[in-house]
Amino acid sequence: MSAFVTCGATVPFPALVEAVLAPEFVGCLSREGYRVLCVQFGRGYDFEAQFTSVTCTRMPLESAEVSELRQLVRDERVTVMGYKVQDVVVLGFAYSNNILQIIDRYGDVVISHAGTGSILDSLRLNKKLIVVVNHTLMDNHQKQIAEKFQNLGHILATNPTAIELCDAMKRLKHEDLIPLSSETNTEFMERLKSIAYS
């Protein structure tokens, strides 16, 4: 199984990246049967620096795992990195215009920042979704959005710590999340507008 993490492409979310790369969380993934963790960390973030104090092995660019993600990213300007941490392959890239295919490939579970676009992308692909609120943002509409989607039963919402993410992963096994309707839903669109503008 694979877990996909998206921080969005525009606003860095270092707390989320650090939480998912923490040994406690990688260990939790391993115990839950996940073998790949793919992280879209956003522009301007030093992903490699996160591995200086972690026991890991850098994977060669020509390895099957790194090569597959490079093909999905479809942009030679974007560096794709891979590390073996414990028994989990950790892949990372800054951004991609092909994000839906990447979510579809690596998202047995998706851990996302609380941006509406990323939430809807994952829900439209019928992915199990854990949403993490970036509390450093001013006028934190992300919290309202995450709470509303959670109250509707579509997602689990949590905070950017390894312990809380592990707890959310365990809860996810027992939650029956409600899929988002695939048809155009005027009621849902109005509800989303009211959340975004309230």
From Swiss-Prot:
GO cellular component, one term: cytosol
EC number(s) reported in the record: 2.4.1.141
GO molecular function, a single term: identical protein binding
GO-annotated biological processes: dolichol-linked oligosaccharide biosynthetic process
Root EC class: transferase
Keyword Transferase: yes
Predominant localisation class: endoplasmic reticulum
Keywords annotated in UniProt: Endoplasmic reticulum, Glycosyltransferase, Transferase
Catalytic reactions on record: an N-acetyl-alpha-D-glucosaminyl-diphospho-di-trans,poly-cis-dolichol + UDP-N-acetyl-alpha-D-glucosamine = an N,N'-diacetylchitobiosyl-diphospho-di-trans,poly-cis-dolichol + UDP + H(+)
InterPro entries linked to this entry: Glyco_trans_28_C (IPR007235), UDP-GlcNAc_transferase (IPR052474)
Cellular localization per UniProt: Endoplasmic reticulum
Subunit comment: Heterodimer with ALG14 to form a functional enzyme.
PANTHER family per record: UDP-N-ACETYLGLUCOSAMINE TRANSFERASE SUBUNIT ALG13 (PTHR47043:SF1)
Function: Involved in protein N-glycosylation. Essential for the second step of the dolichol-linked oligosaccharide pathway.
Family: Belongs to the glycosyltransferase 28 family.
Name this polypeptide is given: UDP-N-acetylglucosamine transferase subunit ALG13
